[in-house]
């Protein structure tokens, strides 16, 4: 049973993280009449613009986090980012707080070490060779073990922050320093990963719901500087590779538990798969599902964590997304060129409403649906390029 927003029966959803993904989750909650409270570290974040109330706090501050939760008494707490005081969520969950999908899943996946050890050591899934290190000296030894080239990442970071490639011994010191500056909670432990010789990588959006585990069609994507630039669905795969991918994803989400949508990242080589990472929430590459599916990843997430059945995931056909990337400094961002960008049918522009920019920032996305993937990707890129960001 669900209540009505702003009434004594209200079903309250508290979002921890209020970026563009949280905004879409908030919109789906609004469609069901839920009361939405958005939290982030800064004011006027995208999800705050479509929420009933909002708070700007340091979500790594356990006391500040607990204060907001105690004040609002939400029915569901929905993390959208990694930089959260997860130990406090674990503590509050034991007292009855409903964390999506679970507090432990949120804690485990915010740290690359936790999820890598779960996948590789407990679930025995194939992964790239890896080592965790705490010092520059340990890094030197780890590079010898995994070989060059290799990737170094802070164990707590996202969107490519602090991530770099070590190609020669001369890169080791630079990469170490960069990783220490890029972690979400400051300097600390890093993971060193050997390269996997893969053909392509996918995001397999996997829903764990009251009526079982469901899969979206695989999403392919192109990365640049550690962040996605284009994504498309469905990614063409062999039947054997898809089956392996689904089996691995199901093992991971069942191990994490709870209800919700998980973004499972996998490398594919022929018929073989290698586990990379998992997020217990909607995935940025899944923005394409706003046009490619009957229920977007955000709608699926809300339906699942509120205990409603999924029944089936319907995909409409070849679709793509292309990021609208800003580069500049402004607290008054404007956009032009939308008329030209929307000149083709089955094309949409989503602008996130981010209040400011200082450097490079993802500000929106163009999404398309076409008769074939090549045209969908090409037209999405064309549409995103026609949007002019004015600083």
Curated annotation (Swiss-Prot):
Superkingdom of origin organism: Bacteria
Pfam families per record: ATP-grasp, PurT_C, RS_preATP-grasp-like
GO cellular component: cytosol
InterPro entries from the UniProt entry: ATP-grasp, ATP-grasp_carboxylate-amine, ATP_grasp_subdomain_1, PreATP-grasp_dom_sf, PurT, PurT/PurK_preATP-grasp, PurT_C, Rudment_hybrid_motif
Listed EC numbers: 6.3.1.21
Keyword field contains tRNA-binding: no
Single GO BP term: 'de novo' IMP biosynthetic process
Pathway: Purine metabolism; IMP biosynthesis via de novo pathway; N(2)-formyl-N(1)-(5-phospho-D-ribosyl)glycinamide from N(1)-(5-phospho-D-ribosyl)glycinamide (formate route): step 1/1
UniProt domain ATP-grasp: residue ranges: 117-306
PROSITE patterns: ATP_GRASP
Protein residues bound to N(1)-(5-phospho-beta-D-ribosyl)glycinamide: 20-21, 80, 284, 354, 361-362
Gene3D superfamilies: 3.40.50.20, ATP-grasp fold, A domain, ATP-grasp fold, B domain
Binding site for Mg(2+): 265, 277
Single Gene Ontology MF annotation: ATP binding
Ranges in coiled-coil conformation: none
Keyword terms, alphabetized: ATP-binding, Ligase, Magnesium, Metal-binding, Nucleotide-binding, Purine biosynthesis
Sequence positions that bind ATP: 112, 153, 158-163, 193-196, 201
Catalysis: reaction(s): N(1)-(5-phospho-beta-D-ribosyl)glycinamide + formate + ATP = N(2)-formyl-N(1)-(5-phospho-beta-D-ribosyl)glycinamide + ADP + phosphate + H(+)
Enzyme class: ligase
Family of the protein in this entry: Belongs to the PurK/PurT family.
PANTHER family associated with the record: FORMATE-DEPENDENT PHOSPHORIBOSYLGLYCINAMIDE FORMYLTRANSFERASE
Biological role: Involved in the de novo purine biosynthesis. Catalyzes the transfer of formate to 5-phospho-ribosyl-glycinamide (GAR), producing 5-phospho-ribosyl-N-formylglycinamide (FGAR). Formate is provided by PurU via hydrolysis of 10-formyl-tetrahydrofolate.
Subunit structure comment from the entry: Homodimer.
HAMAP family: PurT (MF_01643)
Name used for this protein in its record: Formate-dependent phosphoribosylglycinamide formyltransferase
Organism name: Aliivibrio fischeri (strain ATCC 700601 / ES114) (Vibrio fischeri)
Lineage per the UniProt record: Bacteria, Pseudomonadati, Pseudomonadota, Gammaproteobacteria, Vibrionales
């Amino acid at each position: 049973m669900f209540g009505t927003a702003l009434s004594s029966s209200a079903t309250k959803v508290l979002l921890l993280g209020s970026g563009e993904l949280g905004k879409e989750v908030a919109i789906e909650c609004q469609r069901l009449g839920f009361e939405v409270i958005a939290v982030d570290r800064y004011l006027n974040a995208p999800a705050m613009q479509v929420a009933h109330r909002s708070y700007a706090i340091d979500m790594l501050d356990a006391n500040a986090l607990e204060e907001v939760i105690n004040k609002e008494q939400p029915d569901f707490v929905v993390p959208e980012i990694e930089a959260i005081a997860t130990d406090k969520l674990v503590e509050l969950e034991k007292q009855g707080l409903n964390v999506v999908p679970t507090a432990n899943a949120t804690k485990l996946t915010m740290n690359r070490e936790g999820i890598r050890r779960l996948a590789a050591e407990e679930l025995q899934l194939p992964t790239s060779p890896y080592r965790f290190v705490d010092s520059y000296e340990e890094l030197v030894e780890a590079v010898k073990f995994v070989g060059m080239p290799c990737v170094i990442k802070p164990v707590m970071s996202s969107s490519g922050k602090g991530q770099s490639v070590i190609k020669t011994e001369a890169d080791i010191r630079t990469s170490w320093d960069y990783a220490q500056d890029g972690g979400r909670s400051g300097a600390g432990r890093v993971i060193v990963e050997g390269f996997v010789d893969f053909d392509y990588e996918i995001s397999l959006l996997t829903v764990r719901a009251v009526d079982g585990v469901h899969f979206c069609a695989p999403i392919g994507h192109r990365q640049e500087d550690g962040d996605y630039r284009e994504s498309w669905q469905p990614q063409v795969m062999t039947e054997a590779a898809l089956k392996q991918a689904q089996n691995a994803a199901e093992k991971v989400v069942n191990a994490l538990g709870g209800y919700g949508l998980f973004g499972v990242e996998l490398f594919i080589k022929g018929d073989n798969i290698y586990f990379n990472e998992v997020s217990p929430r909607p995935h940025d590459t899944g923005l394409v599902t706003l046009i490619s599916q009957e229920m977007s990843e955000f709608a699926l997430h809300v339906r699942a964590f509120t205990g409603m059945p999924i029944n089936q995931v319907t995909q409409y056909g070849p679709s793509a997304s292309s990021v609208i990337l800003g580069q500049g400094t402004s607290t008054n961002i404007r956009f032009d060129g939308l008329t030209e960008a929307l000149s083709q049918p089955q094309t949409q522009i989503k602008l996130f409403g981010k209040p400011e920019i200082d450097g490079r920032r993802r500000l929106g996305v163009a999404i398309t649906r076409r008769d074939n993937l090549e045209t969908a990707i090409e037209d999405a890129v064309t549409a995103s390029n026609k949007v002019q960001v004015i600083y």
